[in-house]
C-alpha cells in the first residue's frame, strides 16, 4: 500500500486559488490525479507547502498561475519519441547514455575541460524563464559553467542584445573572462556583446556615466567618523568593531536614512538583540557618520548601487537586456536591488548561479523582500561531474547536509551524485613545517610522474602569511610555478600557488591545501576581533566555507596538510 503525506488544509475564510480550473487542465499541467482535491483547496498560505509534494512541472505551473501568469499547457508527446527524452522525464531519471561523452570530456585538454557543459545541464541553459531564475548546487556541479553558457546562449539567440555576465570580485571576473574567451574564441562579434564585470566594477562604470566622478568612502574614513561620533554621543560604550559591523551590515547595507527605519529594520545576521534605548544612542552615532560622509561628498558602494537602482527603476532603456550573475550567494543587499531594477521582472532578464555553502562575504537576507522572487524558477544541480566522489564526500563533511537562505530555499547536499571515482583525499598532520614541505613536495612529484601537468596542480593556503610554506614545497619538487594575484590568470606549464580567498572559480586536477594549523584556520585574528560572542558562529561558518572552497578546487587528487596542532576542521574532514 502507498501512503502520502497530507497536504495542509485551507482555512475556511481564505480564498482558494485553483477552484475554477477543470480537472483536465490540472492534469495537463502535470498534477497527479490523487492530488487534485488538495490542489483545489490550496490557498496562498498552503501553496508553498503543497508544491513541495508535487512533480516539478506541476509546481512551476501552479506557482505561475498563482502569481497571475498563464503557463503553457503541455502537449501529448508522439509515441515514436523516446519518453526519456522529454524534459519532465529528465527531471526524475538520469539516463547515462552520455557516459562516453563524459569520459571523452575528462580526457580533453585542460583548457577545453574547464568550459565543458554536461549535456544534462543544457536544459537549464536554454530554458525560457518567466522571471528571475537561479541554479544552485554544491561545488563541482557546474554552476559557473551553466552561467557562462547561459550568457552565451542569450547573446546568440538575441542578436541585438547586450548581456552582463557579473560575479563577485575582480578575481572571479578575470577567471570568467578567460573561460569566455575559450568558449567563443571563434565568435568575436558575439563576445563583444557580453560584458564580463566584477560587481563593484560595473557599478562604478554605470555610476560615472550617470552621475560623474565616484568618491568612495574608505574603511579608514568610516572608522574615523564612527570613533569621533561615538565619543561625541557618549552614554553607552560600544566597541569600534561592533559599531563598524552594525554600520556595514545594517545601516549602510539597507541604506537607512531615519531613526524610524533603523528602529524597525529586521537585523538579519546580527545576533545580538538591542533594546530601543541602545538603538536610539546608536542612531545618534550613525546619523553623525552619514552627515560626515555627505559633508565630504563621499559615497559607499551600498549607496552607489542604491542610487543606480533608483535610476534604473525609472528608465525605459536599461544598459543591459540580460544579466547573468555567478557566485550569487555573495551578493549584497544593494547589489540585489540593482539587479531587481535592471531586470524589472522581464522574462529571462535575470539568471543567478551560486552555492549557499560557499558564502564567504555577505550576511544572509531575503531576496523576495527586495523584489527578486525565484519561487518555481530555482533549480539545484545534483550531478557533480567536476569533483570525484571521494573528494566531494569528504569536503561535504565540512558543511551540514542542508544549507538554506533567508527565504527558506533549501539546498540539500545529500542528493548530489558524483559521476566518477578517484583516490581518497590524503590528510597529514606533521611535526614541523620542514616535514610538511617535504611531504607536499613528494606528493607533487608523484602527481607529475602519473601524468598530471604542472598547470593542472594548485597549492592553497589560508592567507599571505603562509605563502612561503607553499612556495618552498613547490620549489623543492622542482615544479615551475606562479603565485596568483587578483587577476587569477593561470599559465600553461606552471603550477598555481594561491590564498584560499582567490580560489573561487579555479579548478585543478591535483590540489594541495597546506598550513591547516590551529589558529590559522579558523584564523585566530578574526576570532579575537569579534566584538560580540554571538557573531563567533559567523566567523566559524565563513572559515569552514573557505576550507571547503579550497578542497573542492580538486578534480582528481587532494592532499590536506598541517603542522601539529592541526585545525579542528580537519577532524570533520576525515571520514
Model-identified regions with their sequence ranges:
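Proline-centered turn/helix-capping motifs that create local helix->coil transitions or kinks
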Residues: 91-94, 252-261, 400-409
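ATP-hydrolysis module of ASCE/P-loop NTPase motor domains
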Residues: 3, 11, 37-57, 209-278
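N-terminal accessory nucleic-acid engagement/regulatory domains that precede
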Residues: 3-103
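Conserved helicase motor core of SF1/SF2 NTP-dependent helicases
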Residues: 110, 114, 118-162, 168-216, ...
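N-terminal pre-Walker A segment at the start of P-loop NTPase domains
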Residues: 96-118
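Conserved P-loop NTPase-based nucleic-acid remodeling module centered on helicase motor cores
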Residues: 1, 16, 21-34, 177-251, ...
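Catalytic/regulatory signature loops of cyclic-dinucleotide turnover enzymes
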Residues: 228, 557-558
Amino acid at each position: 500500500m502507498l501512503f502520502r503525506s497530507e497536504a495542509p488544509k485551507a482555512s475556511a475564510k481564505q480564498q482558494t486559488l485553483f477552484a475554477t480550473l477543470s480537472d483536465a487542465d490540472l492534469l495537463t499541467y502535470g498534477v497527479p490525479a490523487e492530488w487534485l482535491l488538495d490542489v483545489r483547496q490550496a490557498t496562498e498560505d498552503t501553496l508553498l507547502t503543497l508544491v513541495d509534494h508535487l512533480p516539478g512541472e506541476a509546481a512551476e505551473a501552479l506557482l505561475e498561475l498563482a502569481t497571475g501568469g498563464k503557463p503553457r499547457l503541455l502537449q501529448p508527446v508522439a509515441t515514436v519519441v523516446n519518453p526519456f527524452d522529454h524534459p519532465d522525464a529528465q527531471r526524475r531519471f538520469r539516463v547515462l547514455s552520455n557516459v562516453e561523452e563524459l569520459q571523452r570530456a575528462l580526457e580533453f585538454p585542460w583548457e577545453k575541460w574547464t568550459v565543458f557543459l554536461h549535456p544534462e545541464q543544457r536544459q537549464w541553459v536554454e530554458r525560457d524563464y518567466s522571471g528571475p531564475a537561479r541554479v544552485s548546487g554544491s561545488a563541482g556541479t557546474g554552476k559557473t559553467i551553466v552561467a557562462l553558457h547561459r550568457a552565451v546562449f542569450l547573446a546568440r539567440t538575441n542578436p541585438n542584445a547586450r548581456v552582463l555576465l557579473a560575479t563577485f570580485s575582480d578575481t572571479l571576473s578575470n577567471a570568467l573572462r578567460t573561460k569566455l574567451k575559450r568558449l567563443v574564441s571563434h565568435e568575436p562579434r558575439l563576445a563583444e556583446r557580453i560584458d564580463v564585470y566584477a560587481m563593484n566594477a560595473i557599478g562604478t562604470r554605470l555610476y560615472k556615466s550617470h552621475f560623474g566622478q565616484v568618491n568612495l568612502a574608505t574603511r579608514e574614513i568610516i572608522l574615523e567618523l564612527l570613533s569621533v561620533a561615538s565619543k561625541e554621543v557618549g552614554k553607552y560604550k560600544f566597541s569600534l568593531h561592533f559599531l563598524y559591523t552594525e554600520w556595514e551590515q545594517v545601516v549602510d547595507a539597507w541604506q537607512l536614512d531615519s531613526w524610524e527605519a533603523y528602529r524597525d529594520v529586521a537585523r538579519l545576521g546580527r545576533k545580538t538583540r538591542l533594546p530601543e534605548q541602545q538603538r536610539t544612542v546608536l542612531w545618534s552615532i550613525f546619523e553623525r557618520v552619514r552627515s560626515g560622509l555627505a559633508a565630504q561628498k563621499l559615497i559607499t558602494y551600498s549607496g552607489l548601487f542604491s542610487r543606480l537602482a533608483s535610476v534604473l527603476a525609472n528608465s525605459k532603456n536599461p544598459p543591459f537586456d540580460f544579466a547573468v550573475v555567478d557566485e550569487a550567494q555573495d551578493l549584497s543587499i544593494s547589489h540585489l536591488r540593482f539587479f531587481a531594477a535592471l531586470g524589472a521582472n522581464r522574462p529571462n532578464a535575470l539568471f543567478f548561479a551560486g552555492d549557499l555553502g560557499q558564502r564567504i562575504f555577505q550576511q544572509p537576507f531575503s531576496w523576495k523582500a527586495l523584489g527578486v522572487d525565484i519561487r518555481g524558477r530555482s533549480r539545484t544541480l545534483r550531478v557533480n561531474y567536476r569533483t570525484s566522489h571521494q573528494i566531494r564526500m569528504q569536503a561535504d563533511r565540512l558543511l551540514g547536509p542542508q544549507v538554506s537562505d533567508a527565504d527558506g530555499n533549501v539546498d540539500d547536499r545529500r542528493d548530489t551524485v558524483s559521476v566518477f571515482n578517484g583516490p581518497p583525499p590524503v590528510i597529514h598532520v606533521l611535526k614541523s613545517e620542514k616535514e610538511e614541505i617535504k611531504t607536499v613536495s613528494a606528493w607533487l612529484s608523484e602527481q607529475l610522474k602519473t601524468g598530471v601537468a604542472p598547470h593542472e596542480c594548485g597549492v592553497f593556503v589560508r592567507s599571505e602569511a603562509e605563502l612561503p610554506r607553499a612556495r618552498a614545497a613547490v620549489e623543492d619538487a622542482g615544479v615551475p610555478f606562479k603565485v596568483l594575484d587578483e587577476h587569477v590568470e593561470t599559465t600553461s606549464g606552471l603550477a598555481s600557488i594561491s590564498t584560499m580567498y582567490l580560489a573561487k572559480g579555479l579548478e585543478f586536477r591535483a590540489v594541495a591545501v597546506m598550513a591547516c594549523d590551529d589558529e590559522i584556520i579558523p584564523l585566530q585574528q578574526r576570532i579575537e576581533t569579534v566584538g560580540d560572542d554571538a557573531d563567533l558562529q559567523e566567523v566559524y561558518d565563513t572559515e569552514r566555507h573557505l576550507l571547503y572552497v579550497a578542497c573542492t578546487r580538486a578534480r582528481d587528487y587532494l592532499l590536506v596538510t598541517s603542522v601539529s596542532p592541526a585545525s579542528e576542521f580537519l577532524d570533520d574532514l576525515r571520514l
